[in-house]
Regions:
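Acidic/glycine-rich phosphate/pyrophosphate-binding loops and surrounding catalytic core
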Residues: 1-69
């Protein structure tokens, strides 16, 4: 599973910025329906599923949140 840093995550849908989206779609070749992990740098780990895989904005639906520390 792939991990992305998302310092400003809120709500149940998160859109990766353009650089992260391009990396996700073009380099890692991830697409809709694939699972990813996200971390906010404040101690919370998120699990999600890619809803829309586009180079300019990859949309992820958050399925689980865990406070790690």
């Amino acid at each position: 599973m792939h991990l992305f840093y998302t310092p400003d995550i809120e709500g149940d849908i998160y859109t990766l910025n353009a650089d992260e989206s391009r990396h996700c779609v073009r380099v890692l070749r991830l697409g809709a329906g694939e699972a990813v992990s996200l971390v906010d740098g404040k101690g919370t780990w998120y699990e999600g599923v890619i809803e829309r895989a586009e180079v300019r904005g990859c949309e992820i639906r958050i399925t689980d949140r865990r406070e790690l520390y």
